[in-house]
Amino acid sequence: MKKTSLKLTTLLGLFLLPFTAFAEEPIQSLNKMSQAMRDLNYELAFVQTTPTNMDSFRYRHIKQGQKVYAQLVTLDGEQQEIIQRGNLVSYFQPGSRAFTINSGEIVDALPAVIRTDFSKLSQNYDFIKLGKDRIAGRFVDTIRIVPKDDFRYQYLVFLDEENGLLLRGDMLDREGKLLDQFRVVTLYIDDRLRGLTDYLNKVSVPPLLNESKQESSLAVNWKTDWLPQGFDLVSQNQDVMDGEVVENALFSDGLFTFTLYVNKADSTAATENTWKQGAYTIYSEVMGDKEITFIGQLPIAAAKRIVQGVTFLK
């Protein structure tokens, strides 16, 4: 009897093993993507598409020891360039004064999914492997990132089968409608890209932007009573616009972000306003003498619930 029980336990373990391994595979592929985007030397030409616009870029990434160099350049219209040298990111744009900020990465035009902590994200999303495809002449693994609630969007990622790099990322609404797409057209991987660092080091570093605001210690007189599970406060700040103080707070779950703005309501302001374009929702509502505005990558229903959950402290 004991032998039979032991045999059944062994067979059950063998039966369950492939399913466990398969369940772990998507997150392993996603973690491989994050590491590849951080550590490899590569050049991407890609397009960023929304329902109303399309822009093309070239992104180069080089890692020398522990220092990262990167360059993002627009390929249409007037050239705009962003250069990363270690923890300094410099912006160059025609007609505007160049400046530098303290940052360990270029975030403009690149999807947030490449910077995500997938272990944390797994608490609020499911990762589903869909199979193979082909992007930019290369075979890719396709993974769907699906929220466990109805308060955020979903993501479809296409990862290079050989090196793990992200070659396409689709942000989709709950019905599968495309909101935003990152799509690589050409990919070049070569350690000889390290020669680009000579050029990047020769470019003068523009003045460092004043970052004297103490965001972490700023106290505001309002709070959010409801947020979708997994969203945390990233930063909060105060700005002065047209002589009026505007308080803002940035929130993120690691994949999607939104900002709440609170300011004194104008006497002519509409009680409620809603605007939607692509992945972005703008929703504002007047409460007493305050106007609360949501701007971010969440559905309108979620934006409305967040705004209506803001309460003011006495």
Indicate residue ranges for each PLM-predicted region.
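Gly/Pro-enriched, hydrophobic low-complexity segments
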Residues: 136-204
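Short, solvent-exposed recognition patches
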Residues: 204-287, 301
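N-terminal leader/targeting segments and the immediate start of mature chains
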Residues: 2-5, 16-67, 104, 122, ...
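N-terminal mature ectodomain segment of secretory-pathway/periplasmic proteins
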Residues: 24-95, 126-133, 139, 146-154, ...
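Sec-dependent N-terminal signal peptides
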Residues: 7-13
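Acidic/charged, solvent-exposed loop-and-adjacent secondary-structure segments enriched in E/D, K/R, S/T
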Residues: 91-113
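Short amphipathic beta-strand/extended segments with alternating polar/hydrophobic composition
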Residues: 56-62, 82-86, 100-105, 181-184, ...
